[in-house]
UniProtKB/Swiss-Prot annotation:
One of its GO terms (cellular component) is cytosol. The keyword Phosphoprotein does not apply. PANTHER family: TRANSLATION INITIATION FACTOR IF-1, CHLOROPLASTIC. Component of the 30S ribosomal translation pre-initiation complex which assembles on the 30S ribosome in the order IF-2 and IF-3, IF-1 and N-formylmethionyl-tRNA(fMet); mRNA recruitment can occur at any time during PIC assembly. The keyword Nucleotide-binding does not apply. One of the essential components for the initiation of protein synthesis. Stabilizes the binding of IF-2 and IF-3 on the 30S subunit to which N-formylmethionyl-tRNA(fMet) subsequently binds. Helps modulate mRNA selection, yielding the 30S pre-initiation complex (PIC). Upon addition of the 50S ribosomal subunit IF-1, IF-2 and IF-3 are released leaving the mature 70S translation initiation complex. GO terms for molecular function: ribosome binding; rRNA binding; translation initiation factor activity. It comes from Rickettsia bellii (strain OSU 85-389). It comes from the Bacteria. Its main location: cytoplasm. This is Translation initiation factor IF-1. The gene is infA.
Length: 73
């Protein structure tokens, strides 16, 4: 699967879970589980409760995703 196949959504972090995992409510109302992308871990970008984030998901599993960007507040 190429990067072109990934779908991007914007959402808000509603719950923090262990191991850099978050529950994110998307703008369309769906709630998914997302983990932090490797680049964000490497650069030590912190994600807090209520942060607005961009999540990328595969079309095969729309319940899980990867946080790729934290929007400035």
């Amino acid at each position: 699967m190429s990067k072109d196949d990934l779908i991007q959504f914007t959402g808000t972090v509603i719950e923090l879970a262990p191991n850099a995992t978050f529950r994110v409510k998307l703008e369309n109302g769906h709630v998914i589980i997302a983990h932090t992308a490797g680049r964000m871990r490497k650069n030590r970008i912190r994600i807090l409760l209520g942060d607005k984030v961009t999540v990328e998901m595969t079309p095969y599993d729309l319940t899980k995703g990867r946080v790729i960007l934290r929007h400035q507040s």
